[in-house]
Amino acid sequence: MISKIVLKSFFKTRWMRHDLNNESQETDRFSEKQTLDVFKGTDHPDLEKGVAAIGNVLKTLPLRPGVYRMYDSKGNILYVGKARALRNRVANYTQISGLSRRIQRMVSQTRSMTIVTTVTESEALLLEAQLIKRYRPPYNILLRDDKSFPYILLKEDGTFPQFPSLQRHRGVKRAKGKYYGPFASADSVTLTLNSLQKLFLLRSCSDSFFRNRKRPCLLYQIKRCSAPCVGRISEDDYRDLAVDTRDFLAGKSTHVQKKLVTAMEQASNDLNYELAAVYRDRLKALAFIQSHQSINSGNLRNADIFGIECRAGLACIQVFFIRNRQNWGHHAYYLNHIDEQPLEDVMQSFLGQFYEDKIAPKDILTNYLPSDKNVLEDALSSQRDYRVKFYQPQRGELKKLVDQAVRNAKEAIDRRLAEASTQKQLLKEMVNLFHLDKIPDRIEVYDNSHIMGSNMVGGMIVAGPEGFRRNSYRKFNIKSPSINPGDDFEMMREVLTRRFSRLERSDPDHSSSEWPDLLLIDGGKGQVHAVKDILAEQGISDIAIVGISKGPDRNAGREHFHLVDGSEYALPPNSGLLFYLQRLRDEAHRFAIGTHRAKRAKNLTSSPLDEVPGIGPSRKKALLLHFGTARDVKNASLSELEKVNGISSAIARQIYDFFHHSPA
């Protein structure tokens, strides 16, 4: 998010937008005061009209830092940019001879602009990064994968702070405790957590689970927990384990190792060989973690290392995370819209988006420095209590680290290009098999999931020539009360009706890339014709529909494919296209089942207290801490409810009435 400094300065920010057609003013959450200024041209791409529209705005632009947005005739954002001097930067778009073909196309589509001035260029950079992630304009360099990274949380804010828990965490950091990360992937967190459980035996359960245990759980049996819930370890000994965990995650692994060796030798000298074996196993777990995190980071304690490589129109940036001199994994990013742009500019745009919602370490190493290095350093440093610096090492161990990141980026591109070549050939085969008009750019696959009609959900996954587009996945909670439990046809009707009625309203011309070229349905002829009828009700007839059904005995590898015209196909068991279509179906099935399980788990953990008006998370927690269970809350007297911390007499009366007053 934007730094506090930037937020304060936005109150000094001036929006400029003149509306030639007296359009209504749009509000924006970044400013208090707005003056609207729109510059419009024709509805069709026209370079002269685009230059004229941009030229009009130059008359009012100051020589101040700020951010500009370019819109097409439909009001869609084409591009978000920032400038040290707005007038000079925007003027460049009127010099056609100096623009690349791609930027000329953008100018020809531009019909209006929005300008926001900021106090400093650093603030403009942070605002630009936030707007790019918010609107994902087609002419900006975009991160294809901008999900948050996972952390390990040593949680100490629960019911039993004397027994901290070790958990994985992703998202907003609300819980009290120490966060360690980021880790590059969920797999790296899982691997580290498993090893930490073997090494330090800290609990990983929730406070409610911990409170209600009467005997040790399975983790104790497999030696991954010390069972503090039932007193198998004292508070002091458990606190020592928590301290060792903090030391290890803070990079003091040698200190922890020496401590374990000393304890093992002492147990052996005391002829307590069983205890010595426990310390031996913990040392093995420590060695395993160290072997998987070993990296020669030189003098770097906390750093991010970036390497960018471009080839065949594809760009990849590899990032390595060094925390407390430990390698916490690496992650590959693939970038869109980098045509004809210097790699310094690509790195500038990428890093601005990357750190928009992440904490930047002190040291950042790259093989190409960002084009506005000083501005980016100022922007990132304004959010921290230390100075963030970018480096481009030329020799030594740090250069080897950057080279390693670049090498990984090259290998990732090689793999992606090989996969793309294979996938393109498979899509060509699909065109011939299913009689499609063109190679499908967007394939949508649908599936439903439920158990005996409960927790009914639908799932939609999206794939294209580049693979799965996970940012476009959608989940649907089945809402219609008239659907009979387990009626797959009616569930599919609701899902498709909601999906395409919304799309039809937003884009009746079918010009958006959100429209699919092919629908792949898990089912046979009946499902295919049902989907055809559902789309026809929406006035949609230009989308190909294919059903995939299990063959005889429902054996995988003997699937049949059903078209709208009634034709049916089967592919050889060793067909690459068959394997690809199975992957699409299985991914939709996995996504739908995962959505269903999450909904079911949420319902299983719901409480009658959730239905009491005026009872939020804090009061619910206070009630459960005081009484133990929702049943005890329900059976409590009014005077007992009034004794709970944070529960007033009025709220106590409200709770009591909810559970004890019968309907008239």
Curated annotation (Swiss-Prot):
Residues 63-141 form the GIY-YIG domain. The keyword Transmembrane does not apply. The gene is uvrC. PANTHER family: UVRABC SYSTEM PROTEIN C, UVRC/OXIDOREDUCTASE. Interacts with UvrB in an incision complex. CDD domains: GIY-YIG_UvrC_Cho. This is UvrABC system protein C. The UvrABC repair system catalyzes the recognition and processing of DNA lesions. UvrC both incises the 5' and 3' sides of the lesion. The N-terminal half is responsible for the 3' incision and the C-terminal half is responsible for the 5' incision. One of its GO terms (cellular component) is cytoplasm. GO terms for biological process: nucleotide-excision repair; SOS response. It is found in: Cytoplasm. GO terms for molecular function: DNA binding; excinuclease ABC activity. SMART domains: GIYc (SM00465), HhH1 (SM00278).
